[in-house]
Amino acid sequence: MEYGSVEKDGSPDLDVDWLDDGWVALLRKWIDDAERAGVAEPNAMVLATVTPDGRPASRTVLCKSLDETGITFFTNYDSAKADDLAATPYAAVTFPWYQLGRQVHLRGPVSKVTAQVTEDYWSKRPRGSQLGAWASQQSRPIASRAALLEQLAQVTARFADHERVPVPPGWGGYLIAADVVEFWQGRENRLHNRIRVTGNRVERLQP
């Protein structure tokens, strides 16, 4: 089977002056643009890591915070991705907005966020999501979905009399500090726009 491509050419050309206010401001704008365009989970990003035996691995996670220090996501610290990051604390992420013909690629060193940062985010999660984090031993095998739902029922009963569900001991956030950020915008004839930010240097790349 052969696949074609869709070229987007309906928006102004991406240029270096779009980054006058920094890469964070432009990334926020593009996430907002995706949300306004009806993209499901506009803050979804593909996280790429390296397994302890040196193999690539990727999965989709949600960007939950974005500022000049980098981007933050949250997960189970006993998950496969956490094992990867313990072995190689460096990662890459890609925000793919196919409907808009845009993507942003970012990579850099990864570190765990503070307990306070985790607590602040945890307090904003719906109770059901909090209970789900307690119920799931992420990346571990389980016999059936029924068994998973039974684990959820058990933790729901456990915290039934608790006004507040505490943060699980093995759960928290990671911060990816951006070494390199690249903005990509599809154009006709495959002459796509690429702008790379490395520290204070902003430069256009050939497609």
Curated annotation (Swiss-Prot):
User: What UniProt keywords are attached to this protein's entry?
Assistant: Flavoprotein, FMN, Oxidoreductase, Pyridoxine biosynthesis
Q: Where does FMN bind?
A: 59-64, 74-75, 81, 103, 138-139, 184, 194
Could you say which residues bind substrate here? 64, 121, 125, 129, 190-192
- In terms of superkingdom, the source organism counts as Bacteria
A molecular function (GO) term: FMN binding
Q: Which family does it belong to?
A: Belongs to the pyridoxamine 5'-phosphate oxidase family.
What's the protein here called?
Answer: Pyridoxine/pyridoxamine 5'-phosphate oxidase
Q: What organism is the protein native to?
A: Mycobacterium avium (strain 104)
Q: What is the lineage of its organism?
A: Bacteria, Bacillati, Actinomycetota, Actinomycetes, Mycobacteriales
